Each structure stands twice: as structure tokens, then as C-alpha cells.
């Protein structure tokens, strides 16, 4: 039973689950951590099927935990990507104003971003906008140079590799679905695991697991599906 006993169990093998596991393992190298993922591979759901945006912290209320967390997280993520040769690009983004009423709001948005520590924010007129994005149809825009994109699936896989390098007793279990749990154990399709500490990073299924823990809440996660199209270059 020793190989099925862990100090901490993390349910969910997406970017949140693996980032949480990596941070814990880095801070406490002797901690024996298990990550449980029901699919055949990590980052199978939202993590591997999104736009890969590195958010800058432009919109959040200055001084709020969310703003500070976003800005600090962006810096840590970019450094981690550089150190580990993860596909990423700090390409910047533009926030488009489609008419004059929206253009007036760009100043406040710029100020908000500057209060959050963003560098290089610039309001663009239509001519400047079209130099960056010739096909944009707005009247003005805010250029946010510190935004970027990253391969989150690759990032998740690197987190997993690092965890096992730090402590070979830690484990990543794929195709291992958590069916039930109590204070001291987890019941899965691969047997029972012993673990007093559990962290749920289960994405769209987090509300269902909360109910299994008898957590009384009126909140319900409603998922929305998006479609991506790959265009042929002309």
C-alpha cells in the first residue's frame, strides 16, 4: 500500500493542477505528491484547447489580489518558458475601439494597466493601428506589448517532468478517474489511494466534486464551447 500513499493528492491534470503540484514540490521537495488525470494524457481538456493567451493584467482592479496575481504570474510564466525552451511569443495585443464612444474609454483602460505596472501601453490612432494589424476595422486601439501567447500543453508537460525530477516518489496518474473520496482516501478506477490532503483542480467538473464533499453551494459551472478555424495562407 506504500506506493499508493501520498502526502498530497491533486485531482486534475491541466495547467492549474500541474502548476499547483510543481509549486508545492519546488517548495517542499520531500513531499510525496500524486496527480490524478482521468484522460489518457495531461492537458486534454481546456488547457490543451484554448488560445494560449498570456494575460497581462490590463483589466483588473489596481491593488486587487487578482491584478497582483496576474502580473506576478505573467512574469513567472515567461521566465519559466525561457528557462525551459517552451514555445511562446510576447507578441503584444491590441484592444480595439470600433467607434468614438469606445475610443474614449481607452484612456481609462491605459491608466488602469499602468497602475497595475504594465509598461509600454500606447493609444493608437487608425493609421498606427493599421500598421500593426492592417485588417482591423476600428477607429483607435490600445497597444499592450507585454501580452503574449504560449503553448500551455507543453508547459503542463514540463511541469510534470520537473515534479518527477525533484521527487521520484511523486507520481502522475493518467487514465485514473477519481470516483469518490473521504477524509483519508481516494477511490479510483485503479484502486484506492491514501491521502489526507487533497486539492481539486478539476476545471468544469469542480462543482460536481464540491457536491461530493457535501459542500453546500448554489453555484454551478456552465461550460461554453468555442470553435477554432485554421485558415489557409494566401
Predicted regions and their residues:
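Conserved Rossmann-like nucleotide-cofactor binding loop
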Residues: 16, 41, 205
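Beta1/beta-strand and adjacent pyrophosphate-binding region of the FAD-binding site
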Residues: 2-16, 34
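Gly/Ala-rich phosphate-binding loop of Rossmann-like dinucleotide-binding domains
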Residues: 21, 25, 162-164
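Dinucleotide-binding Rossmann-like beta1-alpha1 core, especially the glycine-rich loop
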Residues: 52-131, 138
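Helical element adjacent to the flavin cofactor pocket in flavoenzyme catalytic cores
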Residues: 142-197, 201-208
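Redox-cofactor binding/interface segments in oxidoreductases and associated redox assembly factors
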Residues: 11, 56, 200-201
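Glycine-rich FAD pyrophosphate-binding loop
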Residues: 25-49
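Central helical "cap/lid" subdomain
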Residues: 192-234
Amino acid at each position: 500500500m506504500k506506493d499508493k500513499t501520498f502526502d498530497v493528492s491533486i485531482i486534475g491534470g491541466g495547467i492549474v493542477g500541474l502548476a499547483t503540484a510543481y509549486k508545492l514540490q519546488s517548495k517542499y521537495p520531500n513531499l510525496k505528491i500524486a496527480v490524478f488525470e482521468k484522460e489518457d494524457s495531461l492537458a486534454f481538456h481546456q488547457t490543451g484547447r484554448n488560445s494560449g493567451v498570456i494575460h497581462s493584467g490590463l483589466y483588473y482592479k489596481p491593488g486587487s489580489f487578482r491584478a497582483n496575481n496576474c502580473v506576478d504570474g505573467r512574469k513567472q510564466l515567461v521566465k519559466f518558458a525561457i528557462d525551459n525552451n517552451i514555445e511562446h511569443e510576447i507578441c503584444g495585443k491590441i484592444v480595439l475601439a470600433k467607434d468614438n464612444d469606445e475610443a474614449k474609454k481607452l484612456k481609462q483602460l491605459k491608466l488602469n494597466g499602468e497602475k497595475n505596472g504594465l509598461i509600454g501601453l500606447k493609444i493608437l490612432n487608425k493609421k498606427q493601428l493599421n500598421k500593426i494589424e492592417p485588417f482591423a476595422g476600428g477607429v483607435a486601439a490600445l497597444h499592450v506589448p507585454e501580452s503574449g501567447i504560449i503553448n500551455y500543453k507543453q508547459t503542463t508537460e514540463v511541469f510534470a517532468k520537473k515534479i518527477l525530477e525533484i521527487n521520484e516518489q511523486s507520481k502522475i496518474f493518467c487514465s485514473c478517474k477519481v470516483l469518490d473520496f473521504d477524509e483519508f482516501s481516494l477511490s479510483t478506477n485503479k484502486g484506492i489511494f491514501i491521502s489526507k490532503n487533497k486539492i481539486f483542480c478539476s476545471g468544469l467538473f469542480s462543482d460536481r466534486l464540491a457536491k461530493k464533499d457535501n459542500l453546500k453551494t448554489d453555484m454551478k459551472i456552465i461550460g461554453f464551447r468555442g470553435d477554432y478555424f485554421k485558415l489557409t495562407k494566401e
